[in-house]
């Protein structure tokens, strides 16, 4: 199995002036390819230190990926450090030169020697095209001194590194791995990591050889990543699908997707399948729920529109919420959330509406209504003449203003998903 190390170059990383997001991104991408990362190192711009770090890394790992220090400025010394380490020279890469010329001429500038130097690569390397910038990347076989191990050099600009990894480095890694790796996320909402682990313990106790399960909690829920590595693709796919399927059955009430689908995409599919249309009324989330829904292409087919009603006056004028209700219960209450959802339903023409009202913080709290309190309302048209179905709930979050708004929006989407799941199950 191929093992990797990541080396991030730059004094700015060691001084805390910049967060090393490149290393995290590369490690995640390699993990998905079944290549474990043994070590991540940050190194200064000094050539002597780079040579030492590169030499040690190549002594441990078959693949060393380096970001940073390939630009045209004086502190970009990575290429020189590699030249000295491997005792090689530079050569001009025609393909990289064309990329540089296209970018320079497109900006109406003249080609300079400094710009031309960005297309110089270490002798014997495979040049990596830079489709987002000018500095060429490269993949080098480091020769018998380092047991034919490989060094990958990429710029430190995240968008340039990302393009090189996806376009050249990862395909190159796949060609040499000799195995197939399959990843399937089982996405859940409304259940904690520990509870979820208890639910699927029987699956984890009987995993096929080469299959692992990882829990990935985040602000929106917990993803269970099922990973399978095998020499034969057919076996990898079969084992992976079997485990992902077993997990989704055991945790069915919390699973909203198996595979790379978002909660928003799942909800929109459910709305289409049940021939429903959606409208949203928001106070504390300030349009975030509607923004998340409309981030999905094709949402216009089921999303009719929304109301951002931050003040009490807006709630009264736009949604018809009673001033007496607001006075009696306050804006952050189940009663007002229900009235907001009903008003949204009636004034939008949609068949289902959700509403949010809460206290994101840091101010606005009262003794009985703390920061993080959220009231949700949902109204839905029903067949016959009995009027809309209305429900509400209260939740409490713990976070700063930004975190609370995100969690409020997630709670609203969860309420909508649960309502659609119930109606979908009853119609089967």
From Swiss-Prot:
InterPro entries: CinA, CinA-like_C, CinA_C, CinA_KH, Competence-induced_CinA, MoaB/Mog-like_dom_sf, MoaB/Mog_dom. Transmembrane segments: none annotated. Pfam families: CinA, CinA_KH, MoCF_biosynth. SMART domains: MoCF_biosynth (SM00852). Belongs to the CinA family. HAMAP family: CinA_B. This is CinA-like protein. It comes from Chlorobium phaeovibrioides (strain DSM 265 / 1930).
